């Protein structure tokens, strides 16, 4: 009975002790992040770094509309294919759009030399001035300028030709040697295009140009080339057995370009003074154009985001996030929402001794829960919380700033003879994408591991801060909690939280209560020992008596022979 009273006294004393616990915030977030060691870790707060949404529209880029080529391509637009007449007045754009069925290009069959390089040059041009470099009415008085038309380039049901070129043929029975120069006074680069005609027979050569042994020379300070017509029988394309090759060059400001020929020259009529601009480009897309505005355009649609990565399309125009192949890039900013005692981090201390977060603490990441005679409640440790918020915010901003190198990534063009180069380029591009994706994912994994360990370390530090103040005035009872050996009112609790706890002031009371509790425990232990001895002796006596009774009964009924020797 005495032992029971002592145990109840000890239990009653412990139940009424004031307590202070250290813990951390928890909420109903379902955000998950990956770390180096774990996948799908639920956290209280996180930020997404990967944009995966677009509006499905082609928009203005920073307020400037794109140039949609419709059924025409770059070649048809610049040469002046009659089917592209609506594009001839275009002078400025944010980017150029071709579609998958942009078939109106070179109407007279032939090769467009260095066409892919020309597209690359245009990808950095935001506007140009189309001007008459050699006026048709006055530049070629000794040559015919109106007979150079073909059924391969029809317009309104009649034979026609490129609007930006003039196909010169003989006048009468004469094709005098021509020599014409243009001096670039535009203070901009000037794009000049021309053509060389290759007839199928010598008869066609004479009927068009009179001169059997004709030549063409085009020269500037950076371009010099002499051309000879290649007369040969070829299969008909678009009804033409002849071929026409197309050439271009850029004439620098102040430079001169000269055309000299005795036949077969398709001279430029219009040229283009180009203005370069960053952020332009050429995309191939069947997405419709809408009246909207964006800072980043992809062939699939516009992206309006400040995130550093996107997985929508590798081809982008404007200020765009970097393309990666990832499907998830989420960076932890808060704590583990369901902590595990077994969790072990890679970089810092672990607060694994605290099994669960507190949903009741909403004004901070780390803090306290106290209970005394005046009541109980939660209180955040604002200093450690604010330091953590500042540190993590700076880290996230730094990561975004470092990785958010926004840029235009236009596609590269290769002709049908450059398939090996195209395949090699694709492999190189894929390699870069793999590296960027790996770097981005590894960065997020490492930073998430650091962040979660950083939070655990902060909780551990807060616990150590309290333990170092209380010393033996309280005891650790597990799960981040302390039980005081003295009365600790709200003022006392606040002093522990703010680091001003007066240990000597409470040490005498704590010592007495600690000795009293230890004495109760010791007396209880002695009583238990006495009871244990008594129980053992009593059990032995009962066992001996039982064995004797059984033996007597067995001897009396003959089941057991009993002999008594003296």
UniProtKB/Swiss-Prot annotation:
Stated membrane topology is: Single-pass type I membrane protein
| Paired cysteines (S-S) | 21-481, 59-292, 72-84, 107-153, 296-320, 488-492
Q: Which residues are glycosylated?
A: 27-28, 40, 104, 293, 304, 498, 505
Query: Hey, which stretches end up on the Extracellular side?
Result: 18-529
Side of membrane Cytoplasmic, spans: 551-566
- What one GO molecular function would you report for this record? host cell surface receptor binding
Q: Per the UniProt record, which residue ranges are transmembrane? A: 530-550
| Chain residues carrying a lipid of type S-palmitoyl cysteine | 555, 562, 565
Per UniProt, the keywords (alphabetical) are: Clathrin- and caveolin-independent endocytosis of virus by host, Clathrin-mediated endocytosis of virus by host, Disulfide bond, Fusion of virus membrane with host endosomal membrane, Fusion of virus membrane with host membrane, Glycoprotein, Hemagglutinin, Host cell membrane, Host membrane, Host-virus interaction, Lipoprotein, Membrane, Palmitate, Signal, Transmembrane, Transmembrane helix, Viral attachment to host cell, Viral envelope protein, Viral penetration into host cytoplasm, Virion, Virus endocytosis by host, Virus entry into host cell
**Site location (Cleavage):** 344-345
Tell where it localizes.
Virion membrane; Host apical cell membrane
Instruction: Tell me its family.
Output: Belongs to the influenza viruses hemagglutinin family.
Q: Quote the subunit structure annotation.
A: Homotrimer of disulfide-linked HA1-HA2. Interacts with human CACNA1C.
Name the UniProt record assigns to this protein: Hemagglutinin
- The protein's organism comes out as Influenza A virus (strain A/Swine/Indiana/1726/1988 H1N1)
Gene that encodes it:
HA
